[in-house]
Amino acid sequence: YNLVSKANDQIEFSAGWGQTGVIGKLSLKFTNFSMKNFLNPKTYKGIIPQGEGQTLTLSGQTNGRYYQAYSISFMDPWFGGKRPNTLSVSAYFSKQTDISSNYLTNSGYGYGYPGYGYGYPGYYGGGYGYGSNYYGNYGYNNSYEYAYDPDKSIMMFGLAAGYGKRLNWPDDYFQFMATLNYQLYMMHDWDYFLVNNGNCHNINLELMLQRNSIDNPLYTRKGSQFMLSVAATPPYSLFDGKDYASMSSSDPDKYKFIEYHKWKFKAKIFSPLAPLTVKRTPVLMTRVEYGFLGTYNKNKKSPFETFYMGGDGMSGYSSTYAQETIGLRGYENGSIAGNGGYNSYGYAYSRLAMELRYPFLLEPSSTIYGLVFVEAGNAWTDLKNFNPFNLKRSAGVGVRIFLPMIGLMGLDWAYGFDEPNYGSNGKRSGSN
């Protein structure tokens, strides 16, 4: 039989207006793309060539003049055409700018003059409120939009190329993936962390071994997912002859070439609580995750690739360097690690969870299920302080909705039972 791949393209669009200007995101995902037929107009359906089951994703995001991000990725699940070997290539670029220092010193919250009256001087200033300030006159105004300072910026550029191969041993569910990554960070008067100016290069090789035996990616009733990965850069400090102990943390040359080794383990197990012949089978999902970021030289501890923990786990723009976002429902974003204070950088993390899922609708065109969960996790700035029993706990409820043209949407509400780590704003509950 001659089988023809069926397209399941997706488009994501959102737009709005905020105090920084236009806010929006546009993402196009073509799931039956054909690179081989790119120059063959007869194979085009719409604006792209189709027919080989390859995936092409284009994405753009903006938060006014303060943040823009663009990415493109290509994935061929049958590279070579004979075996399910995966080839992936991607590139991205983002730019974030800061606000003027005058705004920080001349604005405040609340009624009255900036930094005075019924309010207090905040890190991001007042913006809204009746009174006068550095950037406006009396009356209600939005000064944040006018505090834009293009001379303070961080730009990030990245490339990645990966190759994956399905293994026959120990069983057919195993897959091995190797990815070569390059990231360039270009900073100019970026005042938030150690490096304020200069360029930093991150060249690393990531090796990943995973096993996936789930029966359905949308509503999984049985099976498991295991993943073990390590990403490592060359150990520059072992052969470049530099005395990093005598270099200050703000010296751009200290982190010109970033070095680290990063280890991660993730596991999910799905257990049906009723016979699989029952259409609406409740499922118990258990999850375990650990992550560690190590160094070759104690005097060259990377501020990049650390763990940003807490909140919804959705990656977006921030004033920090490249960090891996780890969600912990029931706590504010970055309140466990990443928002400054004692846990500015997370070099180790642990996360455990149990979810009881029940399907309300299981149809080819849409899937809806609800869930209740308990979750616990924590992050540490030093590997020596890692303690898998010292965790921040939470519990909550949620819902997942899948629509073909939109994709998977989710809404969770959780309450955190423990105080966040020092340096956070202390908030624990809320929707994620």
List each model region and its residues.
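Active/binding-pocket-proximal capping segment
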Residues: 18-20, 91, 288-290, 368-379, ...
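C-terminal outer-membrane beta-barrel translocator/porin domains of Gram-negative envelope proteins
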Residues: 9-20, 29, 188-360, 372-373, ...
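Gram-negative/organellar outer-membrane beta-barrel architecture
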Residues: 2-219, 225, 329, 408, ...
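C-terminal beta-signal and terminal closure region of outer-membrane beta-barrel proteins
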Residues: 314-320, 384-432
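Hydrophobic alpha-helix feature that most strongly marks membrane-spanning transmembrane helices
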Residues: 33, 79, 272, 336, ...
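Alpha-helical scaffolds flanking conserved acidic
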Residues: 54, 367-368
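Secondary-structure transition into beta-strands, especially the periplasmic turns and strand N-termini
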Residues: 167-174, 275-282, 363-365, 407
